[in-house]
Structure formats: structure tokens, C-alpha cells
Amino acid sequence: MQTITFGLIATSDRASSGVYADEGIPALKNWLGSAVKNPIRFVEALIPDEQAEIEAVLRRMADDEGCDAVFTTGGTGPALRDITPEATLAVIDKEMPGFGEQMRQISLYYVPTAILSRQTAGIRGRCLIVN
């Protein structure tokens, strides 16, 4: 079976500065490990909520690291520093709005504040990027 390469990016000012441990990347690794039967290679980044840095890491993972898909955690809410969707939209070739719509719909069953999420997704080259 072909190895699938997943990029995992956690955007958080506090976790990236060591205030608390990131839980997003371990949760994604656990979920992907149980959902995907192919061998998996992970490329990881824990970075602050800085649009230029998020854009650079998304480009690196899609263009240089050969990621088949990149998943981000954090930075999709309405707070001023939540800019992950803007960074994603800046680097993708095609937007895939159905991903965000579906994730919000499912999340609303569990968390009423899911409606505040600005999740998006898109394609860069041959890489799917999902917030």
C-alpha cells in the first residue's frame, strides 16, 4: 500500500509559546491512525497565530513536503487573532466550501458554539487543506 503523508498544523499563540500543551495534533494523529489503513507519514508544526507563518507552513507542507492532505487545528473562531481561514484562502488554488459546511453541521450536535466556526478547505496543487 502507498504511504499517505499528512501535514498537521496547530495554530495557537499560547501552545506554541509553551503556556500549555497542544492537544490538537495528538488527537488528529490518533483519529487518522484509526481511520486510514495505509501506512502514514506525519509532518507536524505547532505555530503562533501569525498569518504569514501559517501561509508559509501550508505552502511548505503542500509544495515541499509532499503532503497529500494538511489538517489544521485552531484559529477558526471569531477572535481577532483567529486567522487560519484567511491564511488558507491565501494559499489555495480552489476553495472546497462543503467541508466547512459539513463540519459545522456535525459539530452543532455536540457544541452549540460550532456556528461561530469559520472552517474552510481547499486544494493547493494536489494537496487537500482542511481547517
Please report, for each region that a protein language model flagged, where it lies by residue.
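Non-catalytic beta/alpha edge segments that cap or flank active sites
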Residues: 1-131
